[in-house]
Amino acid sequence: MNIRGIILEGYSNSGKTSLLRALKRYQAQDEASESSVVILGEHYSQILHNVHGKFVRLSREQHLDLLKSRVDLIKPLNDWANFLGPGRRKSRGLFFILERFHLNHRAAFPEADEIEITELEKQLCELGANCILLTLSNEKAEERIKSRNPDEWVGKPREDMEQACEDLIETQNNLRIQAAKSLVPTKEINTDRKDWNEYARLIMEDYGFA
């Protein structure tokens, strides 16, 4: 197989963007790694979008179409590499990273028919995708939420923070449930320590994605 990929899933404060940067650095420093890389952040795959200053939430069908279009961007690249035949990973290989993808969809539409998202997951598996679900310990939720935008919480009622923590914990649990249903192989990483470089090494070496 000429292609491999990582899908980063998790709540807003779990560290997806920080880990994405660390993975980019790790892959770039490996002399034998792929020269061809496709990285799509969450703005290319999430459900809620800021469109010209207004927040727009995609329907289930719209979001499925969006995810399918992203996979359809990657598949022809892999087909071309396969057409060329065997070759070194550096020259013929393709490495991709996607953020907030199939698990985000499953968690947002848990009661929907799974046929279409399962078919998409089959295609992701054929493209060598592995999913990393980033989570926090419950007791770290408040600290992580505050660390992102400290000024935002100044003067706010305590109840607002309690609700934000509940939302984080509930979303994490929902993502775990959906990961168990998904066809895409998934590993969970607790990001309490914020050791992004070590998490990247763990993914690329110890988990056998390298």
For the regions a protein language model found, what residue spans apply to each?
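Hydrophobic anchor at the beta1->P-loop junction of P-loop NTPases
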Residues: 8
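Conserved Walker
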Residues: 18
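Glycine-rich phosphate-binding loop used to anchor ATP phosphates in small-molecule kinases
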Residues: 65-127
